[in-house]
């Protein structure tokens, strides 16, 4: 008995069914890491980008009022913990960062108890 072989039409149909079952990402783009900072409203309402993929390097497509612009993410998710001023902070009292992107991993650049900023674990 001859073996049953699917024809080219059956192969194309199978491929189409497989592709229909895959989850779709809008525009096929992946969101870049980081979080957009709060930006001043752009009065021109310029639409520089629609997604992160349209921005160079590690810039993100961020909302600025009615505009969207490519901007360097400098804020990470979470919020800074409240500083307890009742107790003096031990350790070096100097600035360790200026923006979140200066801190490794998930750490955020936040004010510490001695009036400077350092990389700390955020609150989620």
From Swiss-Prot:
The keyword Repeat applies. GO terms for molecular function: aspartic-type endopeptidase inhibitor activity; cysteine-type endopeptidase inhibitor activity; serine-type endopeptidase inhibitor activity. Disulfide bonds join 36-62, 45-66, 49-61, 55-70, 80-110, 93-114, 97-109, 103-119. Transmembrane segments: none annotated. Epididymis. Highest levels are found in the caput and proximal cauda regions. Lower levels in the distal cauda. Not detected in the efferent ducts. The keyword Signal applies. Residues 1-27 form the signal peptide. Gene3D superfamilies: Elafin-like. Residues 29-73, 74-123 form the WAP domain. GO terms for biological process: antibacterial humoral response; innate immune response. Keywords: Aspartic protease inhibitor, Disulfide bond, Glycoprotein, Protease inhibitor, Repeat, Secreted, Serine protease inhibitor, Signal, Thiol protease inhibitor. It is found in: Secreted. It comes from the Eukaryota. SUPFAM superfamilies: Elafin-like (SSF57256). Glycans are attached at residue 44. One of its GO terms (cellular component) is extracellular space. Broad range protease inhibitor. Possible function in sperm maturation. Homotrimer; disulfide-linked. This is WAP four-disulfide core domain protein 2. It comes from Canis lupus familiaris.
